[in-house]
Amino acid sequence: AKLWRELAELPTVFVPPLHAREGLEKYNLRIARELSLDGPYPMHSVWTTPRGAFGKTLLLELQRGCARSCSYCTLPQCFGRMRFRKFEAVEKAVDDITARFDIPQAGLVTPEAGDYPFIAPLLAKLREKEIGVSFASLRLDRLTPDMITATSESGRRSVTVAPETGSDGLRFACGKKFTNDLVVEKLAMARGLGIDKAKLYFMVGLPGETDEDVSAITALCRRIIDETGLALTLSVNPFVPKPRTPWSAENFAEVRTIKGKYEKIKKEMRSITKKTPQLRLTGVKEAEAEFRLAWYGYKESAALAAAVENGETRLPEGDRARAAEEIARFI
């Protein structure tokens, strides 16, 4: 197809139907190094429609990249250093769009909205235009009263945050340098500004994790409920090591190990009788599929399809190392 051929000419794009026919090795693919956001690239949705995944929400990009290096996260490697849209450009875009269209809500696209240096004046601008706000990501240690107020004024009574673990030490090892005290403090602030529910993301199977670390998830949830009165929903997911991250060489936990941690959490959560948290546990097979997709290259896809068809669930010995070598050729 014409589109495939045109895309294949770009040095940072891999088009399997074309490239794989002659072998990936002969293509010198590289990661794009465009760092500036001041170029002629769209910063917002071209159009909105109630039939789309985000409905009438206008997606507004503020930032790319990240200054942190969380041990499990691919974002710094994928998007490079942190850089921001100029506030004047974002403000002009909001003015131009609202002059022509009725925009009920803006979705702020950014790795972490609290890192955007102009988040306060932007929220004030959107409030002035009577535009609701939704955040793609909220990091607890960057959460501000303005952000919570914007959330509640938009009609939402829930926030989503990711403590990752109930243990301060293990959270620090993950790269999130904040304590349980701060988690409770920020959620108490949210409660005082009109929020009554919180969704918390946790991981199990982290490197160095102990039974005490797993139990700490329940202990933290109990403390949040006791001190804030929030209703909690927990999303608990197995740790999946990803290429090009500090923890890329760590093991993906065995199925029985993950299931054992899940059972421990379910049992201990039942001991919370006051506003017992709702538990959502990511399926182990789903996490395994994520692991394989992260590590398999094009060459391994046929083996993956056969393994799935045969009911196999683990990455065959040696494939992960070969995938790492193949990924290195893109760098």
Predicted regions and their residues:
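Conserved SAM/AdoMet-binding glycine-rich loop
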Residues: 91-233, 241
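A glycine-rich phosphate-binding loop feature that marks nucleotide/adenosyl-phosphate handling sites
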Residues: 6-17, 111-116, 138-142, 205, ...
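Terminal amphipathic helices with adjacent charged low-complexity linkers/tails
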Residues: 4-11, 20-33, 80-86, 103, ...
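Structured core elements
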Residues: 14, 36, 45-49, 57-65, ...
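Acidic, Ser/Thr-rich peripheral helices and adjacent loops at domain boundaries
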Residues: 252-266, 300-309
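Acidic, low-complexity intrinsically disordered segments
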Residues: 1-88, 329
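Hydrophobic alpha-helical scaffolding
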Residues: 48-52, 56-64, 68, 76-87, ...
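Radical SAM enzyme core and accessory elements
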Residues: 271-331
